[in-house]
Swiss-Prot record:
Belongs to the peptidase M76 family. Has a dual role in the assembly of mitochondrial ATPase. Acts as a protease that removes N-terminal residues of mitochondrial ATPase CF(0) subunit 6 at the intermembrane space side. Also involved in the correct assembly of the membrane-embedded ATPase CF(0) particle, probably mediating association of subunit 6 with the subunit 9 ring. This is Mitochondrial inner membrane protease ATP23. GO terms for biological process: mitochondrial protein processing; mitochondrial proton-transporting ATP synthase complex assembly. It is a peripheral membrane protein. It comes from the Eukaryota. The keyword Ion transport does not apply. The keyword Ribonucleoprotein does not apply.
Length: 247
């Protein structure tokens, strides 16, 4: 998944351990500590530091639960996500000869991401959804659809992710087919900037270039733009497994 331009550098984020006494982050005691923190009444420096640490744990726990709830909902009810998981399962059955294989939802995980991105795909590990970056269910639908296109490509075309042309082609397809470049999304991100007539293609190209720039084999933006241009025509027009751009 690509990053949008001009984002700040990665934050120093880490998963916070649960407090020794879970009662301190529940019920009246958590309300009392929150009131104390916000008003400063009776708040010691040590209590302030501990509250901030515990707050991060509570926040990450809530984000994680919401992320998995949204993931499970999309796996049941999103037409794009359901279709893509069906197509991926079909490819897996064809490759293995095992007709009992279903899509493995355990390979879609939620976690905290320091980088300013909403998700990622790793051929060995599966799909990552960034619980602290995804603002709502509908952004997750775009993100999950994007990463599922990468997973489909990995199975269908045996992508070499260190080959810049392979990588660029999959990024073009993922941004084109996921819905992340539809008009409403571009307006949300960029307002009235750019041409609405060419907005979809400009968005797909921009996001593909940014993703390729993140490949360790890519020297700079100029090379990323050149590679995307070289694969553009064939990859933008390749809508498999859809018959056309669905979203």
């Amino acid at each position: 998944m690509s990053k949008e331009p001009n984002f700040p550098p990665s934050e120093k984020l880490e998963k916070v351990e649960a407090p020794a006494d879970l009662r301190s982050i529940a019920g009246f005691e958590w309300w009392r500590r929150t009131f104390e923190y916000k008003t400063g009444l009776g708040l010691t420096p040590e209590a302030k530091v501990q509250y901030e640490k515990d707050y991060q744990y509570v926040l990450q726990r809530e984000q994680c639960k919401q992320c998995y709830d949204n993931r499970d909902w999309l796996l049941k009810y999103s037409p794009t996500v359901v279709f893509m998981t069906q197509q991926i399962a079909k490819l897996n059955r064809r490759r293995t000869g095992d007709d009992s294989l279903h899509f493995d939802t355990s390979k879609i995980i939620c976690d905290v991401c320091p980088e300013w991105k909403s998700g990622g795909f790793n051929p060995s590990l599966g799909i990552l959804l960034c619980q602290n970056r995804i603002r709502d269910k509908w952004q997750m639908e775009d993100t999950l659809s994007h990463e599922l296109v990468h997973q489909f490509d990995e199975l269908k075309f045996e992508v070499d992710w260190m080959n810049l042309k392979h990588h660029a082609c999959s990024e073009v397809r993922a941004s084109n087919l996921s819905g992340e470049c539809r008009l409403s999304q571009e307006f949300f991100r960029r307002g009235f900037n750019g041409s609405f007539g060419r907005g979809h293609q400009e968005c797909v190209r921009r996001r593909a270039v940014l993703s390729v720039m993140g490949n360790p084999k890519c020297k700079d933006k100029a090379e990323a733009e050149q590679i995307v241009d070289e694969v553009w025509q064939s990859c933008f027009n390749d809508t498999r497994p859809f018959e056309e751009i669905y979203r």
